[in-house]
């Protein structure tokens, strides 16, 4: 009799165990995170570097270091890591967490809820799907000299400054980023634009150790397809 009761009650006991909670992401909460500077520790938000609209159809007057994330959720990979690689990102939310940790200087990255919320928003803006990989490129000068930037149009340069630099270096003063010196050679500024915090130099194969996450630097680099050498 005791054995019979044990057999009958065992399934009930197992059924009484709590099911693991499934976290559901909300696109509206993810959009809030996308525009939220407090998500990081330095004032940067996702939208500082990536638009959430189709840049070919819309223009807000800014030139960002990163490509638009409109439709990016359907890319086959992110950060140049192929799906079969051991360190590949499972989805765009996991790839975005890298930016939160490094560029936004948040060592805690994202909570599980924030991660699924942000992923939900990036999937929500996936109307124009991108089925091809986005190559991770850099326009860093392989010689490291950055020659040929001595001449330029000052008026055009002013317009470009406000489109690309002003949000982090307001009127060349300190803001999210440090104040910009006005007495350096053109090569100095060109190197900063192309290499950023060192990631641009590493991707170009100039220096495998140029990108150091522990350095405290977080300036993104501008590749040639974001800002041409002429600009």
Predicted regions span which residues?
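N-terminal Sec/ER secretory leader and immediately downstream segment
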Residues: 20, 24-39, 44-47, 51-63, ...
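Extracytoplasmic/secreted proteins, especially bacterial periplasmic and envelope-associated proteins
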Residues: 25, 29-33, 48, 91, ...
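Substrate-binding/catalytic groove segments of enzymes
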Residues: 104-107, 175-177, 198-213
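C-terminal capping alpha-helices of c-type cytochrome domains
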Residues: 93-134, 217-231
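Electrostatic cytochrome c docking/interface patches
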Residues: 16-40, 127-160, 178
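Bacterial N-terminal signal peptides
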Residues: 1-11
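Sec-exported extracytoplasmic/periplasmic mature domains
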Residues: 35-39, 51-54, 97, 101-105, ...
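Gly/Gly-Pro-rich "capping" loops immediately C-terminal to redox-active cysteine motifs
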Residues: 42, 47-93, 170-201, 218-224
